[in-house]
């Protein structure tokens, strides 16, 4: 739903991430694998290296993933498992590095914004600190490209997206890719350059019952549905994969959005101005008091995009 990027310069971030590894040793192990599997080497990008696997951009990772998995698809189940296990044992074992990877993402000096699930924006995944000073990680380090299908991208910086357990679980995303072709996959990761779900998709409230009294939607929620106005068809795949329509129409999530729609409809700009005049405060201050835009942005409230969209507030 939102791009997942650090606010520091990319070359600084990459340099910091590479320091987490013995890149020379990983390159040596990779060279051994390429010697052992020349047919795989032949289908991978010519400029592939351990460094590029660790910090290459998502489009590059997609190319590696698609080449590797396409090659394996031509093999028997037994051979596929054997090859993948060989790459895991040969140096590309995410489990051996997962603690330092999650710590890297949580490290405030790396300036990642991790507050709500990047995919759904419904679940709060903010890391918190216990009384004894220990940090508790609430997010899951989700692999956009499955590490089980392609161990080569298992430790790749731009393959990580902090998500909630629901989005990362087997009933939703699991090991699936977002998109079907290499081109689609390369564009649909929140880590991809040009990813723009937030601006290309808008939440809207649809009235299901013609002629229904449209004053207090929260009192008859079944007459309404949360839908998506999709400016670029590609993002429908994200909506479908993460079951966003079902989840935003479920229980308290839907009720909360309808509540704020009601509040906005009762308080159009002319009413806000009247209230501001009565209270002798500026329009902007009154607007903030009613709709909490700055406050919720600062506090990183979940579902804030959807809330603003249904209130028709940019």
What are these regions (language model features)?
Residues 2-36, 217-314:
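C-terminal, charged low-complexity interaction regions
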Residues 38, 74, 132-133, 180, ...:
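Intrinsic-disorder/low-complexity loop/linker signature
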Residues 117-120, 164-167:
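Short cysteine-rich clusters marking metal-coordination/redox-active sites
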Residues 115-118, 125:
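Extended, Lys/Arg-enriched charged tracts that mediate electrostatic binding to polyanionic substrates
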Residues 1-105:
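N-terminal accessory alpha/beta regions
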Residues 122-159, 173-179, 184-186, 191:
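Histidine-centered nuclease catalytic patch
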Residues 103-113, 152-157:
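Short, flexible, mixed-charge glycine/proline-rich loop motifs
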Residues 151, 170-236:
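Domain-level detector of nuclease and nuclease-like folds
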């Amino acid at each position: 739903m939102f791009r997942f990027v650090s606010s520091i310069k990319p070359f600084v971030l990459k340099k910091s991430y590479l320091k987490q590894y013995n890149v020379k040793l990983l390159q040596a192990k990779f060279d051994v694998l390429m010697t052992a599997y020349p047919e795989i080497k032949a289908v991978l990008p010519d400029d592939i290296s351990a460094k590029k696997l660790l910090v290459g951009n998502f489009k590059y990772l997609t190319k590696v993933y698609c080449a590797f998995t396409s090659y394996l698809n031509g093999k028997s189940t037994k051979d596929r498992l054997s090859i993948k296990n060989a790459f895991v044992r040969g140096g590309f074992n995410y489990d051996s590095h997962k603690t330092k990877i999650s710590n890297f993402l949580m490290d405030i000096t790396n300036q990642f914004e991790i507050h709500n699930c990047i995919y759904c924006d419904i679940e709060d995944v903010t890391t918190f600190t216990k009384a004894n000073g220990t940090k508790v990680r609430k997010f899951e380090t989700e692999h956009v490209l499955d590490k089980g299908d392609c161990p080569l991208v298992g430790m790749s910086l731009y393959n990580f997206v902090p998500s909630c357990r629901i989005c990362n679980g087997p009933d939703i995303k699991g090991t699936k890719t977002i998109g079907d072709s290499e081109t689609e996959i390369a564009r649909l990761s929140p880590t991809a350059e040009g990813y723009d779900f937030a601006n290309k998709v808008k939440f809207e409230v649809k009235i299901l019952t013609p002629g229904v009294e449209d004053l207090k939607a929260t009192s008859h929620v079944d007459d309404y549905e949360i839908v998506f106005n999709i400016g670029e068809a590609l993002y429908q795949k994200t909506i479908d994969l993460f079951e966003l329509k079902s989840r935003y129409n479920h229980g308290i999530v839907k009720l909360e959005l309808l509540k704020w729609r009601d509040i906005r409809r009762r308080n159009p700009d002319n009413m806000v101005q009247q209230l501001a005049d009565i209270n002798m405060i500026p329009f902007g201050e009154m607007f903030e008091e009613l709709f909490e835009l700055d406050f919720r942005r600062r506090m990183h409230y979940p579902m804030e995009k959807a809330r603003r969209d249904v209130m028709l507030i940019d």
